[in-house]
Amino acid sequence: MAELQQLRVQEAVDSMVKSLERENIRKMQGLMFRCSAACCEESQASMQQVHQCIERCHAPLAQAQALVTSELEKFQDRLARCTMYCNDKAKDSIDAGSKELHVKRQLETCVTKCVDDHMNLIPTMTRKMKESLSSIGK
């Protein structure tokens, strides 16, 4: 993928992840740590009970992190498939005898369209993740 296009996607995804971390994940981390601390304050509990309590406290955060990771992987896979299609199209054009400059332009245009299309998916993906993260916290 063209470096500029890659940078555009990376900055948009980084911004989304920072927003999710600030608005959702961080609150869940705070709850998890306070919950875990309460487990440790339980003087009558056995070591195993305290450990299980801490595991229960950590479960929502682990679920949230898994959700974000899964959505980002799906997004990355879709973008990779799109750019792979562009590469295949360019290779087919070269095999058919097209000029290299024409093929490069065609490839650039195709990759830019992939990036534009996927950039347009980010707001919906963000909203969907925020909704899912909110429901995990409850």
From Swiss-Prot:
PTM annotation (Phosphothreonine): residues: T124, T126
InterPro entries for the chain: DUF842_euk
Keyword Ribosomal protein: no
Gene Ontology cellular-component terms listed: cytoplasm
Modified residues (N-acetylalanine): A2
Keywords carried by this UniProt record: Acetylation, Phosphoprotein
Pfam families in the cross-refs: DUF842
Family: Belongs to the FAM136 family.
Designated name of the protein: Protein FAM136A
Species, as recorded: Bos taurus (Bovine)
Gene (UniProt): FAM136A
